[in-house]
Curated annotation (Swiss-Prot):
Protein name (record): Thymidylate kinase
Lineage: superkingdom: Bacteria
GO cellular component terms attached to this protein's record: cytosol
Native source organism of the sequence: Xylella fastidiosa (strain M12)
Catalyses which reaction(s): dTMP + ATP = dTDP + ADP
HAMAP family associated with the record: Thymidylate_kinase
SUPFAM superfamilies for this protein: P-loop containing nucleoside triphosphate hydrolases
Lineage: Bacteria, Pseudomonadati, Pseudomonadota, Gammaproteobacteria, Lysobacterales
Length: 217
């Protein structure tokens, strides 16, 4: 079966504080979309490229200042946009991102940098067709981090995650949809899939009826 092409492609960004379930949802959505013949690519930010790797190394040690982190994040994102996001959207694929520019706005904003300036710095980044914000209280996010066998880093404190959550919720982006991620993974997936299908219904039109029927099944 040939992959179904979506006119102009589709960009799905999954956001939320640490422990919200972003990676799980990204994988589940990709599996479902691929299963009905939609070419789907999953990526993440920071990426595995040189700038993203540098940032993750810094996150473990906390040696970068917020301003330095912004510089590295923007370099990583520009490369991501140029090398993967724009080309894949251009060929009609669904691109699912596990974190995108709203994470930088929330986390660096929580560190004290101006939110408006952070948004402006990301003006080059294509806006998502749907931005799925998985909302959980910090206590639940931290509990999930411990339960998966990880140790919270210097970003992952109740106070910092609370500030990040507030910024995420306050961001005024037209494609943002908030999902209660305190629910189980199946419920979150169902809600997210419904929101993705709304966009697909418009993009695919009558030609996508079969695809949408399979997704709903």
């Amino acid at each position: 079966m040939h992959d179904q092409i979506i006119p102009c492609g589709m960009l799905v960004a999954i956001e939320g504080i640490d422990g919200a379930g972003k990676t799980t949802l990204a994988r589940s959505l990709a599996l479902k979309l691929r299963g009905v013949g939609l070419e789907t690519v999953v990526s993440k930010e920071p990426t595995n490229g040189p700038w993203g790797t540098l940032l993750r190394q810094s996150a473990a040690t906390g040696r970068f200042s917020p301003e330095e982190e912004v510089d590295v994040l923007l370099r990583d994102r520009r490369q991501h946009v140029e090398d993967l996001i724009v080309p894949m959207i251009g060929r009609g694929a669904v691109v699912i991102l596990d974190r995108y520019f709203p994470s930088m706005v929330a986390y660096q904003g929580a560190a004290g940098l101006p939110v408006d300036a952070l948004l402006e710095a990301n003006a080059f980044a294509p806006r998502p067709d749907v931005l799925l914000l998985l909302d959980v209280p910090p206590a639940i996010g931290l509990q999930r981090i411990w339960e998966r066998g990880s140790t919270p880093n210097h970003f992952e404190t109740t106070e910092n995650l609370s500030r990040c959550r507030d910024i995420f919720l306050a961001l005024e982006l037209p494609s943002k949809r908030v999902i209660d991620a305190t629910a189980n993974a199946e419920t979150v997936f169902s809600a997210a899939l419904g929101l993705v299908m709304e966009v697909l219904r418009v993009r695919l039109g009558a030609l996508g009826a079969v695809v949408l029927e399979r997704l709903a099944g």
